[in-house]
């Protein structure tokens, strides 16, 4: 109402007399006419005020970007500088909030109001040079006892292992070997055989093909797929040909599933992706009904998508650049992080993937998310963390860690474990926020509010 009165006052000053009181000198203009004109102006002002309020609310809605587009902003929390690469989550203490597991430690979630993430050791992990024996972690109930266990694999350590959840605090988790394997750098969780139970697939099985592990039975069952020519740096799972079956994606082509449980696959050497990251993602980028690919150069510069064109014998692929500004794009993830109902692409730079020998090893660390225009196939980049301490190691975890309704991001790497808190919904108290911000001085700053003497511009004659 106060805004309406101000609007009417301004209108009285700005509208010409002809509009407010009739034509000058026309004394026959009735009082009723004046009242009607004034009422019309009042309605216009109210509508303008309500429109302005509506626009203001749209602009100030948390997570709202320019033009009303959904946009997410993140604050980075460095939980520790411990050697880490793989990362997963589970509720370790039963408080209803997911905790972060990475390497030998788990980090206790402080809850909805924020605070310190306390570190606890729950297992032992070996380190060779600067490589930790933990290039990937997945929470899976391996022994079907109702408690999630942790499955891991690594580049320089023999085997794929699972760590048994003792369901008791303060007890070290027992280590079990699933299979003998070297150079198992990364993997992907997906339901490969369509039984409704997530499986794991790994690249670099003794340089002689891939393995996928079925966890539906009493004991994990290991399946071997392909040979050395089909294997490589990177792996993914997607239905390439639209037959409803999960196919396997490698840097050298794809394995069409005929019957996964019986080991029947057809090889299609359709592409060469060099050292792709994990995972190679299958996604219909331009919404044309065909499965496209998204991949990053794990040890060089570049983030790309391959457009699938044609089908059957005429199927071919066209590479299109998404972003070539940063290197070591070793981990990717599709997830809705801005709350618009559509998945965004998460990508970031890994630190010292090859001991500092990769191109751009010491470029600034970055993590971005990309909105995908499904009509044109265009990608728009938004920052998550730029030139900070957070980089993308070998995995992204996207989950509502603080239970406030938006999706947060967790990463681990050689610069430590990071919780990237989504501020689209922020329920952390002001007092806690101020503890987290870098500024720790009292207000006002020394000298604040004092008059500052204006210096004369250069060349001014001295008095």
List the model feature ranges, each with a label.
Residues 39-51:
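Bacterial N-terminal signal peptides
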Residues 3, 22-25:
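Residue-identity detector for glycine
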Residues 29-40:
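Bacterial N-terminal signal peptides that target proteins for export
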Residues 1, 10, 19-20:
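Methionine residue identity
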Residues 6-7, 12, 45:
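Cysteine-centered motifs
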Residues 11, 17, 29-31:
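Acidic, Ala/Val/Gly-enriched low-complexity intrinsically disordered segments
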Residues 52-463:
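Beta-propeller-forming repeat regions
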